[in-house]
């Protein structure tokens, strides 16, 4: 092997270093002349080799554009196999940016800008720190990592768009389970016997239909709660990704409660016959629909991003939602 400061020679292959990244070239001999043919980023070549060795793709060498450009697809072929190879090349190139500094900044971005939970953020960091797999966590993580890098001008928007087009999040199997009123009542009683604080969380979940993370957030500053005419609402205005709650509607006035999501998880672990708190949300949506609350209003109350209503008109639904919520509040009085 011969080398200089930025060039390493291994037989007929050259490895060049550029800005901390490595690129592979192959020496080719033609009419007595030696030419260097660009093969691709080292990470692409290694990952493609491993994929081919495992039988994931065929045996055609990966082709890519010269350094400074995003990986090309001239040697990728067509059809499903070509699409898979392009994805491998794109993901391999993206992984080169998973440096310690970028990973730390990405974690801060997930927690502070995207509002993602600590556990989920750590799962995403774990996903981009390992070779890409076709799992929902990895798919979401790589897409978010591409968005993050583009937002910091570390990669071009065009490259981020290629990642978003190539890496799709596979749909999860639909969970159609909706608990019965009897199951809800039983869980509330179990929660009350377990802890008054845990019971309070479950009660607000039943009244509001919002997520556990949102309930815990409003209980940090309960003094912002507004009550009147048998209905209370909390101006939360918390959005992240596809989730966004403007107001938390409920009946029981809020109070400061020292409880964490781990306490809820512990309760659910200890009481296998209790309904998980996430299903309270589904029960609320189902009951509101039974009470003829419009679907758009249910979405607004439960903090789903609008699909049937334009975003600019979404926040104006507050007055309508407040009146419609009274139907559910009346029903709750008998529970």
UniProtKB/Swiss-Prot annotation:
Known InterPro entries for this protein? CB (IPR044068), DNA_brk_join_enz (IPR011010), Integrase-like_cat_sf (IPR013762), Integrase_catalytic (IPR002104), Integrase_SSV1_C (IPR031857), ORF_D-335 (IPR012922)
Read off the Gene3D superfamilies from this record: Intergrase catalytic core (1.10.443.10)
Per the UniProt entry, the Enzyme Commission number(s) are 2.7.7.-, 3.1.-.-
User: Where is the region Disordered?
Assistant: 62-82
Identify which residues the record assigns to the active site.
Answer: 211, 281, 314 (o-(3'-phospho-dna)-tyrosine intermediate)
User: Per its record, how is this protein called by name?
Assistant: Integrase
Described by its record, this protein's role is as follows: This protein may encode a site-specific integrase, which is necessary for integration of the phage by site-specific recombination into a tRNA gene of the host chromosome. Essential for virus infection.
A single Gene Ontology MF term assigned here is: transferase activity
Give the highest taxon in the source lineage: Viruses
Question: Which source organism does the UniProt entry give?
Answer: Sulfolobus spindle-shape virus 1 (SSV1)
Please list the residue ranges annotated as the Tyr recombinase domain: 174-329
Domain Core-binding (CB): where? Answer: 97-189
Indicate the family of this protein. Belongs to the 'phage' integrase family.
Please list the GO biological process terms of this entry.
Answer: DNA integration; DNA recombination; establishment of integrated proviral latency; symbiont entry into host cell; viral genome integration into host DNA
**Which key words are in the record?**
DNA integration, DNA recombination, DNA-binding, Hydrolase, Transferase, Viral genome integration, Virus entry into host cell
